[in-house]
Amino acid sequence: MPTINQLVRKGRKSHKGKSKSPALGFVYNSFKKEEIKNPSPQKRGVATRVGTMTPKKPNSALRKYARVRLSNLIEVTAYIPGIGHNLQEHSVVLIRGGRVKDLPGVRYHIIRGTLDTAGVDGRMQSRSKYGAKKPKK
């Protein structure tokens, strides 16, 4: 515990929180070849690899993921939500933050229904989260 004198001299340092999705916090300037801190809610990227991985211990499945090279040249692993997808290598995707609890190292989600990613077809509930159009009556 600090003394009163130490607190007067130095004071308390406020804790800076760490970002849970750090790749969304930078923009790459290709002219100056430098990264600038400029946080954004989503980022565009190109899928470099699409595959499946198995979740952590109590769960069992084949979760779909894509390795994405973002527009700021950072490469991240993103989860593909929903049943079925049309992604392949070189597909242009939009990612958002949000981790998948049982996949280590997956801190981002791919947004369905934008750019090259098709929405989930046959989806009736929570359609906006999966890019599904309203069904015809």
UniProtKB/Swiss-Prot annotation:
Q: Which domain of life is it from?
A: Bacteria
User: A single Gene Ontology molecular function, please?
Assistant: structural constituent of ribosome
Chain residue ranges for the region called Disordered: 1-22, 37-57
Quote the cellular component terms of the Gene Ontology held in the record: small ribosomal subunit
Q: Does the keyword rRNA-binding apply?
A: yes
A single Gene Ontology biological process assigned to it is: translation
- List, alphabetically, the PROSITE patterns matched: RIBOSOMAL_S12
- InterPro entries, alphabetized: NA-bd_OB-fold, Ribosomal_uS12, Ribosomal_uS12_bac
Question: Per UniProt, what is one Pfam family of this protein?
Answer: Ribosom_S12_S23
Positions of post-translational 3-methylthioaspartic acid modification? 102
UniProt keywords (A-Z) are: Methylation, Ribonucleoprotein, Ribosomal protein, RNA-binding, rRNA-binding, tRNA-binding
Q: Locations of Basic residues compositional bias?
A: 9-19
Q: Which NCBIfam families match?
A: rpsL_bact (TIGR00981)
| Family label | Belongs to the universal ribosomal protein uS12 family.
Quaternary structure and partners:
Part of the 30S ribosomal subunit. Contacts proteins S8 and S17. May interact with IF1 in the 30S initiation complex.
Quote the PANTHER family the UniProt record gives.
30S RIBOSOMAL PROTEIN S12 FAMILY MEMBER (PTHR11652)
Q: Which HAMAP family match?
A: Ribosomal_uS12_B (MF_00403_B)
Describe its function.
With S4 and S5 plays an important role in translational accuracy. Interacts with and stabilizes bases of the 16S rRNA that are involved in tRNA selection in the A site and with the mRNA backbone. Located at the interface of the 30S and 50S subunits, it traverses the body of the 30S subunit contacting proteins on the other side and probably holding the rRNA structure together. The combined cluster of proteins S8, S12 and S17 appears to hold together the shoulder and platform of the 30S subunit.
Indicate what this protein is called per its UniProt record.
Small ribosomal subunit protein uS12
Natural source organism: Limosilactobacillus fermentum (strain NBRC 3956 / LMG 18251) (Lactobacillus fermentum)
Lineage runs:
Bacteria, Bacillati, Bacillota, Bacilli, Lactobacillales
Supply the gene name. Answer: rpsL
